[in-house]
């Protein structure tokens, strides 16, 4: 039996045969391959370690550089702080030295003054609160007079320079030297006459009264003739005593400012103003055509074409007021005057305001005696008054009420209460209001022109106030009066709440674009023939004014005593004369 070799049991026995395919590998083969692999791995690890070390060194270098930069920046900041501290210390030292120097200079002066002062000298500390009211009022008046005087000098110098420059510019293109000299000579004569007039104190005796043509709550309007040149003017007089009692200082100031600032053909022209101990005087152009109220009383109603003409001109007049920065607040037919060509002009700016502090009664009240304005002088519903009418409005038809209203219409204009028919509701309830309140008045006038009476008229002013405040329920269009859709729409868009009223956002342009004014030439409407042109027999013709209703009046305003002259503070600076109105309107 042959012995077989079994793997793992050692060498086969002697004489046995080993299988050919199980020959062992050559000696040392596995050891050689293992050594080569270990060598390559070691080299790779060394290379990686070198790269890692180099990266660590680079990062350390970057970090050290960053730290150095931070240290340098901190050092710079510390140096700057030290420099600032040094500068502050130097400034403090300089201030201390300057103060010491001043003290050293003052000490000899104080010593010299002390040596000059008598032994019984007593230091005095001003205490204005211990002075009498009369003394304080005189001090206020003196301060106001000085301020007004020097402001006027500066303003007149500026205006004179501007006029001279304008005159020279107008003749730069003159064809001949002769014409240029003639223009400048005429300008010099006008300037001389104007300066002479400014130096002359104007007085009531310079005018002759022709006729009284109007009365108001606080004064009257007279047709006067100037003695030296025979020119005709309208003189408005206001009693200072009444202005004081009714606290109308702000209204007087506002009216004068509007007329002085205006140079519009839609506003009555002011030539000059002055005052004396008793009265304030406004010398204005005379408009012989009367007022719109007289025309409404005479004709009852207007056609839509005539209404369109007058309302369009009123839009332009109100726009001119608003461009000056003022609000009229009392636009009504009484204050719409008609000139000799039949076109309208606005007047009576007693309730206007430019929202300037001097247009506030509270400002003057505080300035005069340190108290708030009297609430009774503010605009608002009147208190209950004795009813003079015996009519019961419940038993009167609308036509009868209008007839009664028309009879008393002019008398109401003369009273101190006035008529509230055209005033916007937001003014009565003391809400905030702006220029849109004048557009409400325009809507009320348009209603009266087309219908024949104001939209909220009543026998008593208090009833009118109530209707205006509740306009949503009381505004009604009569069934027997035909109005075009455009006219009724315009009235409704004017007689509405202030936030929805036409003209609130876009001003006059919104109203101009309304279909009711389609075809109106706004740029040249004053050049067209008016529907009504007054027929005048002379320059003093007053036939269009209700002078018969005024009764007999004296040639001069009534004279009365006025004991408190210290109350003239609000009237300082009232005197006015402007070169433009004195020359361009041929007043000289």
Curated annotation (Swiss-Prot):
GO terms for molecular function: ATP binding; identical protein binding; protein serine kinase activity; protein serine/threonine kinase activity. Disulfide bonds: none annotated. It catalyses: L-seryl-[protein] + ATP = O-phospho-L-seryl-[protein] + ADP + H(+); L-threonyl-[protein] + ATP = O-phospho-L-threonyl-[protein] + ADP + H(+). Keywords: ATP-binding, Kinase, Nucleotide-binding, Phosphoprotein, Serine/threonine-protein kinase, Transferase. Residues 43-76, 100-117 have a biased composition (Low complexity). Gene3D superfamilies: Phosphorylase Kinase, domain 1, Transferase(Phosphotransferase) domain 1. The keyword Phosphoprotein applies. The keyword Kinase applies. Residues 1-76, 100-139, 370-389 are annotated as: Disordered. PROSITE patterns: AGC_KINASE_CTER, PROTEIN_KINASE_ATP, PROTEIN_KINASE_DOM, PROTEIN_KINASE_ST. It is an enzyme of class 2 (transferase). Its EC number is 2.7.11.1. ATP binds at residues 213-221, 236. The active site is at residue 330. It comes from the Eukaryota. Residues 518-586 form the AGC-kinase C-terminal domain. One of its GO terms (cellular component) is cellular bud tip. GO terms for biological process: budding cell apical bud growth; cellular response to salt stress; cortical actin cytoskeleton organization; establishment or maintenance of actin cytoskeleton polarity; intracellular signal transduction; maintenance of protein location in cell cortex of cell tip; positive regulation of establishment or maintenance of bipolar cell polarity regulating cell shape; positive regulation of exocytosis. Residues 207-517 form the Protein kinase domain. Residues 29-42 have a biased composition (Polar residues). It holds the Pfam family Pkinase. Protein kinase that seems to play a role in the regulation of cell morphogenesis and proliferation. Belongs to the protein kinase superfamily. STE Ser/Thr protein kinase family. COT1 subfamily. This is Serine/threonine-protein kinase CBK1. It comes from Yarrowia lipolytica (strain CLIB 122 / E 150) (Yeast). The lineage of its organism: Eukaryota, Fungi, Dikarya, Ascomycota, Saccharomycotina. The gene is CBK1.
């Amino acid at each position: 039996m042959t012995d077989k070799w079994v793997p793992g049991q050692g060498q086969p026995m002697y004489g046995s045969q080993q299988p050919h395919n199980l020959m062992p590998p050559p000696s040392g083969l596995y050891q050689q391959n293992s050594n080569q692999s270990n060598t390559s791995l070691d080299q790779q690890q060394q290379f990686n370690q070198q790269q890692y070390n180099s990266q660590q060194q680079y990062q350390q270098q970057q970090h050290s550089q960053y730290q150095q930069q931070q240290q340098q920046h901190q050092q710079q900041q510390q140096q700057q702080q030290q420099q600032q501290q040094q500068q502050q210390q130097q400034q403090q030292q300089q201030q201390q030295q300057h103060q010491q120097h001043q003290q050293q200079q003052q000490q000899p002066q104080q010593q010299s003054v002390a040596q000059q002062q008598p032994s019984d000298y007593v230091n005095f500390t001003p205490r204005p609160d211990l002075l009498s009211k009369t003394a304080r009022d005189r001090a206020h008046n003196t301060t106001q007079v000085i301020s007004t005087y020097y402001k006027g000098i500066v303003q007149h110098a500026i205006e004179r320079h501007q006029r001279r420059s304008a005159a020279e510019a107008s003749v730069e293109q003159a064809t001949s030297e002769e014409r240029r000299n003639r223009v400048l000579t005429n300008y010099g004569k006008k300037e001389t006459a104007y300066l002479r007039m400014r130096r002359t104190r104007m007085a009531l005796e310079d005018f002759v009264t022709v006729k009284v043509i109007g009365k108001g709550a606080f004064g009257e309007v007279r047709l006067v003739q100037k003695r030296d040149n025979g020119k005709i003017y309208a003189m408005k007089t206001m009693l200072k005593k009444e202005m004081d009692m009714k606290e109308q200082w702000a209204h007087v100031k506002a009216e004068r400012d509007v007329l002085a600032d205006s140079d519009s053909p839609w506003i009555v022209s002011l030539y000059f103003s002055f005052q004396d101990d008793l009265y304030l005087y406004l010398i204005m152009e005379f408009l012989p055509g009367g007022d719109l109220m007289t025309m409404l009383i005479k004709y009852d109603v207007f056609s839509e074409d005539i209404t369109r003409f007058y309302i369009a001109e009123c839009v332009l007049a109100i726009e001119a007021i608003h461009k000056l920065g003022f609000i009229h607040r009392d636009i009504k037919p009484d204050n719409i005057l008609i000139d000799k060509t039949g076109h309208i002009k606005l007047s009576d700016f007693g309730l206007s305001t430019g929202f300037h502090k001097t247009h506030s009664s509270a400002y003057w009240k505080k300035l005069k005696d340190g108290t708030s304005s009297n609430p009774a002088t503010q605009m608002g519903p009147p208190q209950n008054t004795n009813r003079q009418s015996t009519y019961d409005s419940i038993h009167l038809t609308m036509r009868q009420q209008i007839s009664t209203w028309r009879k008393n219409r002019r008398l109401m204009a003369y009273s101190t209460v006035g008529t509230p028919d055209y005033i916007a509701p937001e003014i009565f309830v003391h809400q905030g209001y702006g220029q849109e309140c004048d557009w409400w008045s325009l809507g009320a006038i348009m209603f009266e022109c087309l219908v024949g009476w104001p939209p909220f008229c009543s026998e008593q002013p208090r009833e009118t106030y109530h209707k205006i405040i509740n306009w949503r329920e009381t505004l009604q269009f009569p069934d027997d009066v035909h109005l075009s859709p455009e006219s009724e729409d315009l009235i409704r868009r004017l007689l509405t709440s202030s936030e929805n009223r036409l003209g609130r956002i876009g001003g006059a342009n919104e109203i101009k674009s309304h279909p009711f004014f389609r075809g109106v030439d706004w740029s040249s409407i004053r050049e067209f023939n008016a529907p009504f042109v007054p027929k005048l027999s002379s320059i003093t013709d007053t036939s269009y004014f209700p002078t018969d209703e005024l009764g007999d009046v004296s040639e001069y305003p009534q004279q009365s005593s006025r004991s408190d002259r210290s109350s003239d503070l609000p009237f300082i600076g009232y005197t006015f004369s402007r070169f433009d109105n004195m020359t361009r309107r041929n007043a000289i």
